[in-house]
UniProtKB/Swiss-Prot annotation:
The lineage of its organism: Bacteria, Pseudomonadati, Rhodothermota, Rhodothermia, Rhodothermales. Its EC number is 6.3.5.2. Keywords: ATP-binding, Glutamine amidotransferase, GMP biosynthesis, Ligase, Nucleotide-binding, Purine biosynthesis. This is GMP synthase [glutamine-hydrolyzing]. The gene is guaA. ATP binds at S232, G233, G234, V235, D236, S237, S238.
Length: 526
């Protein structure tokens, strides 16, 4: 049984990053909404609890409050469960226990120099190995002015006289800055100090240990029964297939559907990898005609998603019945590459929200198909799945691949989908990706792709006027896809890509580059 740190989510955009940073220190972490009661946290048997930041003020009526019973939690040895409050987490903790939090006249945002007096390092394990004068990242409006009884300041900045505190009677700490972001120089050290030195975690949780444990868990659960998996060629389903084959061998049956909306070369690449490299039972079917006939004339993105999703389910069920006929019985389990962010989206603290777009994952099959689910990665982040893929010898062109939406190129063609427009987009996209790889930029961005727009523009090729399609290029940097910034690719590089596409893809005469961040935009255009 591994040690565990629980992260309570108060609505911060960095909550997932906190959990990931803790895991990087070899300690397993889980996210729970801040509204969960202390008894439910206690049932998880945590070695420590981290309170995330958040957008609210402790004075907001709708602002989340801290359950005071958190300070009564004990570990099996009878010692208190340590707490670390980050930004709003610090303010909520201090406010709950009698401290004073003041509204700031203006927001403090950006880098600051952390001043840790020598006695602060001596008094607190939190700053062991953290030099005074190191850079930290501030992002807050309210600030702590009077400490709760028994608390003392252990660090400050020029603009924040209370940058970090501790309880002199218990293992309770708070910082006004964000140790989880890369802009905080020694942020990982601070989180490692909390997890290891303060919480006493051993740091034995690793992707390699996960593979061994999951392999045994899957074998024990499945026994001599059979599993099917919808293979898309993306990272999650591909690594899931490799793990399940390691555990089950020929009890795994993969289904790969060509919906006519794949990237250039993807249909052959996936078959070569999983039939050739892994020697899996891979059932393939080319349903291009069926998908494109149903998408004919459709322009609404939500309708596209619905058609692609429903048609996929139909084809998937046909292939499942064929597998059942070969086996003489229906497979018991359906495996999916669900990731931890997919789950914590439904449990994190949120205010009022609206559906922006239906989730890209079309692998969510209806209950009437009557499978038991196996989701081996439901507790992992994308970067952890990539690392596991490398441990399982999944080829790098697949394990390092950028995210690709379930509806495929259907939502990267704005407007009507035709075979001709799909061919244009595939070629433009392939050139963009090829050049990113050739210039060692592919791994520097979270996601990159081309989008075919529903407009045409005037151009000149030689001495002739052209009136052809406009193609947009999109590249973003991100940690988890929840927020993203447009990638600041070199202008010379973009110019070269533009020239190649316009000269090598007849039918496109103009290239534009998307410089929108998420939010307010989304990563995909539809």
């Amino acid at each position: 049984m591994h040690d565990k740190i629980v992260v309570l989510d108060f609505g911060s955009q960095y909550t997932q990053l906190i959990a990931r940073r803790v895991r990087e220190t070899g300690v397993y972490s889980e996210i729970r909404p801040c509204t969960v009661e202390a008894d439910a946290i206690d049932a998880l048997n945590p070695s420590g609890v981290i309170l995330s930041g958040g957008p609210c003020s402790v004075y907001d009526e709708a602002g989340p409050a801290l359950d005071p019973a958190l300070l009564e939690l004990e570990r099996p040895d009878g010692t208190p469960v340590p707490l670390l409050g980050i930004c709003y987490g610090l303010q909520a903790m201090a406010h709950q226990f009698g401290g004073e939090v003041a509204r700031a006249d203006r927001r403090e945002f950006g880098r600051a120099q952390l001043q840790v007096p020598p006695d602060g390092q001596e008094k607190s394990l939190l700053f062991e190995g953290v030099p005074s004068g190191s850079t930290v990242w501030m992002s807050h409006s309210d600030h702590l002015t009077d400490l709760p009884d028994g608390y003392e300041v252990i660090a400050r900045t020029d603009n924040a006289p209370v940058a970090a505190v501790r309880d002199t009677d218990g293992p309770y700490y708070g910082v006004q800055f964000h140790p989880e972001v890369v802009h905080t120089d020694y942020g990982r050290q601070i989180l490692e100090n909390f997890a290891h030195a303060i919480c006493g975690c051993s740091g034995d949780w690793t992707p390699a240990s996960f593979v061994e444990e999951q392999t045994e868990t899957i074998r024990d659960r499945v026994g001599d029964r059979h599993v099917i998996l919808g293979l898309s060629g993306g990272v999650d389903s591909s690594v899931a297939a490799a793990l399940l084959q390691r555990a089950l061998g020929d009890q795994l049956h993969c289904i790969f559907v060509n919906n006519g909306l794949l990237r250039k070369g993807e249909w052959n690449q996936v078959q070569d990898t999983f039939r050739g490299h892994f020697e899996m039972d891979l059932r393939t079917t080319d349903a291009t005609d069926r998908f494109l006939e149903r998408l004919d004339g459709v322009t609404d993105p939500e309708e596209k998603r619905t058609i692609v999703g429903n048609t996929f389910i139909e084809v998937f069920e046909e292939q499942t019945e064929a597998i059942a006929a070969d086996l003489g019985h229906r497979p018991t389990y359906l495996a999916q590459g669900t990731l931890y962010p997919d789950l914590i989206e439904s449990v994190s603290f949120k205010g009022p929200s609206v559906t922006i777009k239906t989730h890209h994952n079309v692998g969510g099959l209806p209950e009437e198909l009557d499978f038991d689910l196996i989701e081996p990665f439901r507790e992992l982040f994308k970067d952890e799945v990539r690392e596991i893929g490398r441990l399982l010898d999944v080829p790098d062109p697949i394990v390092g691949r950028h995210p690709f939406p379930g509806p495929g190129l259907a939502i990267r063609i704005l407007g009507q989908i035709t075979r001709e427009r799909l061919a244009l987009l595939r070629e433009a996209d392939a050139i963009f990706i090829e050049e990113l790889r050739a210039n060692d930029l592919y791994d520097e961005v979270w996601q990159a792709f081309a989008v075919l727009l529903p407009v045409q523009a005037v151009g000149v090729m030689g001495d002739e006027r052209t009136y052809e399609n406009v193609c947009a290029l999109r590249a973003v940097t991100s940690v988890d896809g929840m927020t993203a910034d447009w990638a600041h690719l070199p202008h010379d590089f973009l110019g070269h890509v533009s020239n190649r596409i316009v000269n090598e893809v007849p039918g496109i005469n103009r290239i534009v580059y998307d410089v929108s961040s998420k939010p307010p935009a989304t990563i995909e255009w539809e």
